[in-house]
Amino acid sequence: MSENAETFAFQAEIAQLMSLIINTFYSNKEIYLRELISNASDALDKIRYQALTEPSELDTGKELFIKITPNKEEKTLTIMDTGIGMTKADLVNNLGTIAKSGTKAFMEALQAGADISMIGQFGVGFYSAFLVADKVVVTSKNNDDDSYQWESSAGGSFVVRPFNDPEVTRGTKIVMHIKEDQIDFLEERKIKEIVKKHSQFIGYPIKLVVEKEREKEVEDEEAVEAKDEEKKEGEVENVADDADKKKTKKIKEKYFEDEELNKTKPIWTRNPDDISNEEYAEFYKSLSNDWEDHLAVKHFSVEGQLEFRALLFVPQRAPFDLFENKKSKNSIKLYVRRVFIMENCEELMPEYLNFIKGVVDSEDLPLNISREMLQQSKILKVIRKNLVKKCMELIDEVAEDKDNFKKFYEQFGKNLKLGIHEDSTNRKKLSDFLRYSTSAGDEPTSLKEYVSRMKENQTQIYYITGESKDVVAASAFVERVKSRGFEVLYMCDPIDEYCVQQLKEYDGKKLVSVTKEGLELPETEEEKKKFEEDKVAYENLCKVIKDILEKKVEKVGVSNRLVSSPCCIVTSEYGWSANMERIMKAQALRDSSTMGYMAAKKHLEINPDHAIMKTLRDRVEVDKNDKTVKDLVVLLFETALLASGFSLEEPQSHASRIYRMIKLGLDIGDDEIEDSAVPSSCTAEAKIEGAEEDASRMEEVD
């Protein structure tokens, strides 16, 4: 058969990964067994699911099990399953030539100091065999192909050949040639310990071939010889007494026997009161391939018109690919009457709860249900509704412990905000879980706590969105609100923009952005009167500014939100904020037509108490066609854009204006600068008309 052997090179990333696994010291090498058993369990799941619609698939072997055989003499450990098996193409692709999406991510995580036990989460668990083996031989038989053998000593290549193994009628057999310094993994005690620790809740029998001793009676040849001597001496024998009884002796004989290591019944079928935290932790790890314990668990059953049991877990941390749409998540396993149906039942959980791990075991769904049928199933819709309700309870329980909830929120806060955007039914409940930094202190606060601290005359919840806490805390928009003693929520996560589009109010209080038009702060009669007077006093300046800026702004008006800044740019109540515009511009597949009408409505608000605005108003009153006014207005507008969180369409012309101001401040005339030092494109557009004669007047504005 060797003439039919084909040699393949490992894909570059896989070769690198194997080199890393082989040449780096890892203390917890035992996880290789967990990974291989987990893969075997997946293969058994697949054949069992296939057999629901095609029972003949099990003609090649009815019994579904995993068998572990240690051989101390040959220093090999064999793991065999009667699962779906692999075709030749599967062996070539899955075990070497096609890198999984997680290969590179796992290597980066390893190099960053992650634990080797994370390997299963990245879909490359098979290669952990090389933690303990220097050569691995895989024989596999799929019902749709002949039997083939894969072999590698991890030297950058592997061999695939046709190979018939009478023991493998369907499924996969992995023979690991154990390294000299790892032979303790062949010890029965060690294997039992690892299986109990990592794999006791696998849904198929895990059999270990154990060596045992038994006493066996054999004929005692020495006693027979002595008896013959007696007969020769002519002694009379009492026939009735001991009717030719044979003399025997007991000897010890070695034999092999299959011992089942995981006889525990499915944990979700047991009474929650009888299950320890350690058992939940072990089940969670075997279910999720996580190396850490879970953060929280919910174990319940629903009875009545509909019956199902469920066991749900919240992990300690979010997986690296939590929001990767293309990747199917390993979240909820669906069982029907203890029979595994599918690995990841997306229909059971909304997208925003995709971090929840667990199992659901239904009594009512048909065994042969397909994904298409699931989408139409009314039973499933009821189960889903119950699961989401229980998830809310579970998060509520986590929230009772402040430290635990802080951990949870750091990892899954984005999911809750996505839920507010997507799930109108549970929006109110989800909003209770939100936490934000505020102008009142460093500790994140809930909306409920914010409302409890609101001033008597405050009717709205104020918030600002932005890139970071430091940026929003220093923003011009929060000046007046903070100075009046009102608390402002700081929303610094891009998803907050989508969240507040749906979360219009909380506890009857409207959420209001301090960066948008229509901000109403509680005012005294005196303040209202002053504001009206300011509007009249600055009416002419507002008109001149609007004429200069033309279509760049929709409206120019007097502000009630500024204290130390001369002006700011606000957006219409229903348009995008500056932060949202920034986020949308960063979208590779953005809709440019949406950008047009959502991002265009900018309003310039001026501070009537600021010296710059007062001087500018006086300048306009004297001569509204003053040559410097136009450039000052444009410069103020562009600076306000930047300060308000927007980006400039023409940053170069803004830079040129700034340089011109610096020249004026330093009393540098144009004749002192060589023409070659200033690009013609800049001077043409950016030159301030009448700059020379107005140099002294610019100082007044300062």
Swiss-Prot record:
Q: Which UniProt keywords apply?
A: ATP-binding, Cell cycle, Chaperone, Cytoplasm, Nucleotide-binding, Stress response
Kindly give the Gene3D superfamilies that the UniProt entry links to this protein: 3.30.230.80, 3.40.50.11260, Heat shock protein 90, C-terminal domain, Histidine kinase-like ATPase, C-terminal domain
Which positions bind ATP? Answer: 39, 81, 100, 126, 371
The molecular function terms in GO held by this entry are:
ATP binding; ATP hydrolysis activity; ATP-dependent protein folding chaperone; identical protein binding; nuclear glucocorticoid receptor binding; protein phosphatase 5 binding; protein phosphatase activator activity; unfolded protein binding
Q: Where does the entry say this protein is expressed, by tissue? A: In the embryo comma stage, expression is strongly detected in cells of the head region and less so in other areas. In early larvae, expressed in postembryonic germ cells derived from Z2 and Z3 cells and the head region, in both hermaphrodites and males. Under heat stress conditions, larval expression is not only detected in germ cells, but also all over the body. In adult hermaphrodites, expression is localized uniquely in the germ cells.
In which domain of life is the source organism classified?
A: Eukaryota
Q: Where is the composition biased (Basic and acidic residues)?
A: 224-235, 686-702
Describe, as the record does, how this protein assembles with itself and its partners.
Homodimer. Interacts (via TPR repeat-binding and central region) with pph-5 (via phosphatase domain); the interaction promotes pph-5 phosphatase activity. Interacts (via central region) with co-chaperone cdc-37 (via N-terminus); the interaction inhibits daf-21 ATPase activity.
Sum up the protein's function in the record's words. Answer: Molecular chaperone that promotes the maturation, structural maintenance and proper regulation of specific target proteins involved for instance in cell cycle control and signal transduction. Undergoes a functional cycle that is linked to its ATPase activity. This cycle probably induces conformational changes in the client proteins, thereby causing their activation. Interacts dynamically with various co-chaperones that modulate its substrate recognition, ATPase cycle and chaperone function.
Q: What is known of its domains?
A: The TPR repeat-binding motif mediates interaction with TPR repeat-containing proteins.
Protein name stated in the entry:
Heat shock protein 90
> Which species does this protein come from?
Caenorhabditis elegans
Native organism taxonomy: Eukaryota, Metazoa, Ecdysozoa, Nematoda, Chromadorea
Gene that encodes the chain? hsp-90
